[in-house]
């Protein structure tokens, strides 16, 4: 993985102003760089301040040559390794300076539309005979970007038998490419999307493989100047209903038989529940975990028996048709008085009838076995439902009081994704989303004393050496709650031209990745706007239906439609 990690917070930056085609126009003094914001999941941002006038070599005040060259949509090349696109120029006449905001080049993907309707994709390969297309080729043709490194666990479904490309269905997509990559692709392939703006390459990393090293202990005694903590339970979820495509059976794919999954660990760990309820939940989870493998084996056995039964029924259908055809042939021979051939055909019919009997017996036995297997599955489902769940001694785990108390901790949300073709993939994705949502979001914004000035030159093994990365774990001493908190480094802002005491701000969060599935008002407005545009485009259809269906006149319809 390249350059996710902050190997050092250096102050030596090389800035070049470029045209849209990346042709270099001129250099930008590093003193103009006001701030550089890096984030694990958001678009990186650069702030540049350019003075209108500068002092020339002769000591006279002259117009800054950069002044007329800095234009929107031009690029800034940073350290010959990445590009930022200029989006905002803010001129302050009172200060005779231009404040420039530039975003990492993938920002432009947020201005390119993608619309898909019932399209199957592999990431890097295709099977067009089966109408499965190559997303890499399609992305390159539409945007000029292509995939680079992809972790095997992202690209492939890996089993004991080997690996095969993951297949995803995108049934209704109408958004921008940046959102499609950072939301749909990141979610359905369980990956972190990283953009190489120098080469216009998209890198996909398994979310579980990205830097989780414990790197540094922060407290007011060493690096912290000031600390602000924000916590919120607005989006907390303990029960998540899973909705896939129409062909997916969620209820039949989970041992509890519920259309949802649950996680009450936050309230249990904080002792907000009674001891009786906590004990019941722990025992319930233990018994579900014990019964899960038994249930999975029964489901597998049922699938095998169903497959065998289907094969035998197909064979029996063929036998029925063969017997019918042979009887017709026999009647023809009998009509023509061909006794010899009639006897031969009779022997064939007898043989087929014997096969028919054997198949009917086997099918009946399979159906009886399937009924028994289904009864066992239903019994385990019953034992895994809260109201009827029992412990190893057959005693009910929950009583009316604990069940009523549990209702106080239900916070529902629906996770919907029709891209998955395998219900297990949908359930795993739902578990990841619930894992992000089942406890409050807590973030810390810190002003930090510059790390680099505190690093000792000697390579003493207990001394922090200055390596820290987005996604790394930081142990934070929060004196207000008198606890050491383990948090992820998710964002940082570097101000290279400030003094060391003010040159770095970092954001820490108990959630490594932000939950992108919580719908905001802006999302709803955008979806509504798109729907209205489509409705307007097809308005003639509705008008025809309204006034001309089945040759009924407008007067006959009246004003009720």
Spans of model-derived segments:
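Surface-exposed cap/loop segments at beta↔alpha junctions
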Residues: 65-154, 243, 511, 515
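Surface-exposed, non-catalytic interaction/assembly patches
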Residues: 31, 110-127, 203-286, 522
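Polar/acidic, low-complexity leader/linker segments enriched in S/T/G and N/D
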Residues: 1-28
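Short beta-strand-centered interaction patches in the first periplasmic/extracellular domains
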Residues: 1-2, 87-109, 153-247
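Short acidic/polar beta-strand-loop edge motifs in secreted extracellular
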Residues: 22-23, 30-36, 111-135, 153-183
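Short beta-strand and beta-hairpin "edge-sheet" elements
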Residues: 73-103, 194-196, 222-225, 475-497
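Acidic, low-complexity/disordered segments
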Residues: 100-102, 116, 251-443, 447-561
């Amino acid at each position: 993985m390249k350059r996710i990690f902050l190997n050092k917070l250096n102050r030596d930056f090389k800035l070049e102003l470029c045209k849209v085609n990346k042709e270099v126009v001129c250099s930008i003094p590093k003193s103009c760089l006001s701030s550089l914001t890096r984030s694990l999941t958001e678009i990186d941002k650069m702030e540049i301040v350019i003075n209108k006038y500068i002092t020339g070599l002769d000591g006279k005040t002259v117009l800054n040559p950069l002044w007329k060259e800095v234009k929107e949509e031009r690029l800034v090349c940073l350290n010959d390794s990445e590009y930022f696109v200029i989006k905002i120029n803010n001129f302050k006449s009172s200060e005779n300076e231009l404040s420039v905001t530039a975003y990492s080049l993938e920002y432009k993907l947020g201005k390119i539309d993608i619309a898909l309707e019932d399209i199957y994709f592999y990431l890097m390969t295709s099977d067009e005979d089966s109408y499965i297309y190559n997303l890499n080729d399609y992305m390159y043709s539409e945007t000029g970007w292509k995939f680079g490194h992809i972790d095997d666990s992202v690209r492939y479904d890996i089993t004991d038998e080997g690996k095969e490309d993951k297949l995803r269905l995108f049934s209704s997509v109408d958004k921008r490419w940046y959102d499609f990559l950072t939301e749909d692709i990141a979610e359905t392939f369980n990956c972190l999307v990283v953009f190489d703006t120098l080469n216009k390459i998209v890198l996909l990393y398994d979310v579980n493989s990205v830097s989780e090293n414990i790197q540094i202990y922060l407290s007011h005694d060493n690096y912290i100047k000031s600390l602000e903590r924000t916590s919120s339970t607005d989006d907390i979820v303990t029960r998540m209903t899973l909705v896939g495509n129409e062909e997916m059976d969620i209820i039949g794919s989970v041992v509890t038989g519920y259309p949802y999954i649950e996680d009450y660990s936050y309230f249990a760990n904080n002792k907000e529940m009674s001891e009786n309820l906590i004990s019941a939940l722990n025992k319930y989870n233990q018994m579900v975990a014990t019964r899960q493998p038994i249930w999975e084996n029964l489901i597998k056995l049922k699938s095998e028996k169903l497959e065998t039964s289907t094969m035998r029924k197909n064979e029996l259908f063929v036998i029925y048709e063969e017997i019918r055809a042979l009887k017709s042939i026999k009647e023809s021979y009998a009509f023509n008085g061909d006794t010899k051939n009639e006897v031969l055909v009779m022997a064939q019919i007898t043989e087929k009838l014997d096969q028919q009997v054997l198949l009917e017996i086997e099918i009946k036995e399979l159906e009886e076995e399937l009924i028994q297997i289904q009864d066992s599955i239903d019994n385990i489902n019953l034992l895994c439902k809260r109201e009827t769940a029992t412990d190893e001694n057959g005693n009910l785990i929950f009583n009316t009081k604990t069940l009523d108390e549990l209702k106080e901790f239900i916070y529902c949300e629906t996770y919907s994704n029709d891209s998955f073709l395998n219900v297990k993939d949908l359930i795993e994705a739902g578990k990841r989303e619930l894992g992000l949502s089942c406890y409050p979001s807590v973030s810390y914004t810190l002003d930090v004393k510059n790390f680099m000035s505190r690093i000792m030159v000697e390579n003493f093994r207990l001394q922090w050496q200055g390596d820290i990365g987005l996604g790394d774990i930081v142990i934070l001493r929060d004196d207000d709650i008198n606890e050491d908190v383990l948090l992820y480094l998710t964002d940082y802002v570097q101000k290279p031209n400030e003094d060391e005491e003010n040159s770095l701000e970092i954001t820490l969060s108990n959630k490594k990745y932000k939950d992108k599935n919580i719908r905001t008002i802006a999302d709803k407005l955008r979806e509504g706007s798109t729907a209205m545009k489509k409705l307007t485009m097809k308005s003639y259809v509705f008008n025809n239906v309204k006034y001309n269906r089945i040759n009924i006149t407008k007067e006959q319809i009246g004003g009720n439609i």
